């Protein structure tokens, strides 16, 4: 006589906590499995919502164009295109709009080099 899934779930639903614990232990033993969460899932959710350690150095940065010198607008648009790979219209919009992320996920050294290039072309740049 085979039980249906619904009957099994109904029986489990009616069990007490100690009975559920015994059932889980019996299943572990019978089928040689564990009920432990995978390590990746445990590491993905830090306990208590704790912040990342302060000493951990950030290794990916975003370059944000916060403003520009109007006299050097064309040179800056050209530089934004060269750095980001954007088209002419997108680069122009990014320069004029301000606050746009020009490039993201770059190394510290690359971020410093891009910042230097954009500032030389008249841009005001923030690295986050």
Swiss-Prot record:
CDD domains: Ribosomal_L7_L12
Keyword entries, A-Z: Ribonucleoprotein, Ribosomal protein
Name of one Pfam family that matches: Ribosomal_L12_N
GO molecular function terms listed in the Swiss-Prot or TrEMBL record: mRNA binding; structural constituent of ribosome
Claim: Ribosomal protein is one of the keywords in the record: yes
InterPro entries associated with the record: Ribosomal_bL12 (IPR000206), Ribosomal_bL12_C (IPR013823), Ribosomal_bL12_C/ClpS-like (IPR014719), Ribosomal_bL12_oligo (IPR008932), Ribosomal_bL12_oligo_N_sf (IPR036235)
Family as reported in the entry's similarity comment: Belongs to the bacterial ribosomal protein bL12 family.
Record's subunit section: Homodimer. Part of the ribosomal stalk of the 50S ribosomal subunit. Forms a multimeric L10(L12)X complex, where L10 forms an elongated spine to which 2 to 4 L12 dimers bind in a sequential fashion. Binds GTP-bound translation factors.
Protein name: Large ribosomal subunit protein bL12
